[in-house]
Curated annotation (Swiss-Prot):
UniProt name for this protein: Bifunctional protein GlmU
Role played: Catalyzes the last two sequential reactions in the de novo biosynthetic pathway for UDP-N-acetylglucosamine (UDP-GlcNAc). The C-terminal domain catalyzes the transfer of acetyl group from acetyl coenzyme A to glucosamine-1-phosphate (GlcN-1-P) to produce N-acetylglucosamine-1-phosphate (GlcNAc-1-P), which is converted into UDP-GlcNAc by the transfer of uridine 5-monophosphate (from uridine 5-triphosphate), a reaction catalyzed by the N-terminal domain.
Active site (record annotation): H356 (proton acceptor)
Secretion signal span: none
Cofactor binding, note field: Binds 1 Mg(2+) ion per subunit.
UniProt subunit comment: Homotrimer.
Protein residues bound to UDP-N-acetyl-alpha-D-glucosamine: 17-20, 31, 84, 89-90, 150, 165, 180, 237, 326, 344, 359, 370
UniProt xrefs under InterPro entries: Bifunctional_GlmU (IPR005882), GlmU-like (IPR050065), GlmU_C_LbH (IPR038009), Hexapep (IPR001451), MobA-like_NTP_Trfase (IPR025877), Nucleotide-diphossugar_trans (IPR029044), Trimer_LpxA-like_sf (IPR011004)
Catalytic function, reaction form: alpha-D-glucosamine 1-phosphate + acetyl-CoA = N-acetyl-alpha-D-glucosamine 1-phosphate + CoA + H(+); N-acetyl-alpha-D-glucosamine 1-phosphate + UTP + H(+) = UDP-N-acetyl-alpha-D-glucosamine + diphosphate
Binding site for acetyl-CoA: A373, N379, Y380, S398, S416, R433
């Protein structure tokens, strides 16, 4: 879910840095296109920028990952990306966005596409600072282990004097636990004027964005720091860090849902998606997985080991255990979808039931209808999908196959084991199975013959 903050006082823009190689991920997928809660890291960063009210968003990408640029342009439009080539540091990356923002007059925030937990509310204090007291504002955090981070050298009142990178730090500076998240905000003109004067005379030969702080201080421009929890500014550079960020995100979202009145007996076992909507009064049992696009109404119960994606669950509905709702499933109020039932692109009416071992794909189930165990909506002929519609109050006998396109009318019934290939009119009973015959004594004779054959084989072996 995109978290928003109050309306901006001045126009805002964001420069999202997404040009890193991401080699430590050891994956053919670009780092920022890996997913957290079902959404790419890049999209999480864009969500934060949009939540801040940024009217312009520029994503800085590397020439090595065209997929990243394609993803950004697909969401933001054809002019949303610039290329940093060659990669010469964070300051150089932000400078790559200068021309794209030449006609923008307002405040700019620099963020990172690999920091999915750095949301709009986390960043928002920087805009408050540059609106009221600062020319440049930096987001900092207090690190339990500061090794590897740039250190914030502060004066009283969170006045920021300079940022010292780890490789440039002396022993005393390395003892400082106030660290730089990398997120920085300033007026556009101030930011790019300072960047134009950044030099690369450092251990890595790169142009550091952090050097703008020292330059600002030299020019008697005010610089300030806002602090955020360490967990909210952690970057993702390896698979283990992605898993750690996922765990933090899931924990935060589960807590928020429980505060809103959702019951979770074992919250640590529930996996949510970025846009999962669950109303207060709903119950989510153990080991439930939500993919993107799920909405659950108040009073619904999602029982253990169910999997939902792209589905709507109405008030008082009962799902599972071991149910699967796929995209397009709409479960009406007080409907039941039971164990080992799969529903895809089917609207299930209020009070309808499919309690056991069924596949319902493409179509509808009317109010109060009952779907017997083992029912299959046969929706695919190998080339096309077709729809099955079960009317209000209809009763589908166990082990029925409904071969689409077909309609079972209101109040109609099908006999168990039937293969229904033609429409069934309202109130009718449809049967399609061979007549049962009974041969008296046949089973007894069969067993006797088989036992004799078995005994004869034993005698030969003896």
């Amino acid at each position: 879910m995109t978290e928003s903050v109050s309306k901006p006082v001045r126009p805002r823009a964001a420069v999202i840095l997404a040009a890193g190689q991401g080699t430590r991920m050891k994956s053919p997928t670009p780092k920022v296109l890996h997913r957290l809660a079902g959404r790419t890291l890049l999209d999480h960063a864009i969500d934060a920028a949009e939540g801040l009210g940024c009217e312009r968003i520029i994503v800085v990408v590397g020439a090595h990952s065209p997929q990243v640029g394609e993803s950004a342009r697909k969401r933001l439009g054809p002019d949303a990306t610039v290329i940093q080539d060659p990669p010469l540091g964070t300051g150089h990356a932000v400078l790559a966005a200068k021309d794209a923002l030449a006609d923008f007059h307002g405040d700019v925030v620099v963020t990172y596409a690999d920091c999915p937990l750095t949301t709009a509310p986390v960043i928002a204090p920087l805009f408050d600072l540059i609106t009221h007291v600062a020319h440049v504002a930096v987001l900092g955090f207090e690190a339990q282990n500061p090794t590897g981070y740039g250190r914030l050298i502060l004066a009283p009142g969170h006045v920021l004097l300079r940022i010292v990178e780890e490789k440039e730090a002396d022993l005393a500076t390395k003892q400082v636990k106030h660290c730089n998240s990398g997120v920085l905000a300033a007026d556009r003109a101030v930011l790019f004027d300072l960047l134009a004067n950044v030099r690369n005379d450092n251990a890595k030969g790169e142009y550091y964005l952090t050097d703008v702080v020292g330059l600002a201080h030299e020019r008697h421009l005010s610089t300030r720091t806002a602090f955020a929890p360490e967990a909210s500014v952690q970057g993702v550079n390896a698979q283990a860090e992605l898993a750690a960020a996922e765990a933090v995100w899931q924990q935060n979202r589960r807590k928020a849902l429980m505060v809103d009145g959702v019951t979770m007996p074992a919250p640590d076992t529930v996996h949510l998606a970025w846009d999962t909507q669950i109303a207060g009064g709903a119950v989510v049992e153990q080991f439930v997985v939500f993919g993107p696009g799920v909405s659950v109404a108040s009073g619904a119960v999602i029982k253990a080991f169910s999997h939902l994606e792209g589905a709507v669950v109405g008030e008082g509905a009962l799902i599972g255990p071991y149910a699967r709702l796929r995209p397009g499933a709409e479960i009406g109020p007080d409907a039941h979808i039971g164990n080992f039932v799969e529903v895809k692109k089917v609207k299930v009416g209020a009070g309808a039931k499919a309690n056991h071992l069924s596949y319902l794909g493409d179509g509808s189930v009317g109010e109060k209808a009952n779907i017997g165990a083992g029912t299959i909506f046969c929706n695919y002929d190998g080339f096309e999908k077709f729809e099955t519609h079960v009317g209000k109050g209809a009763f589908i006998g166990s082990n029925s196959a409904l071969v689409a396109p077909v309609r079972v009318g209101d109040g109609a019934m099908t006999g168990s084991g039937s293969v229904i290939t033609k429409d069934v009119e309202d109130g009718a009973l449809a049967l399609s199975r061979a007549d049962q015959t009974s041969k008296a004594g046949w089973a007894t004779k069969f067993r006797a013959i088989k036992q004799a054959q078995k005994d004869k084989k034993k005698d030969k072996k003896a």
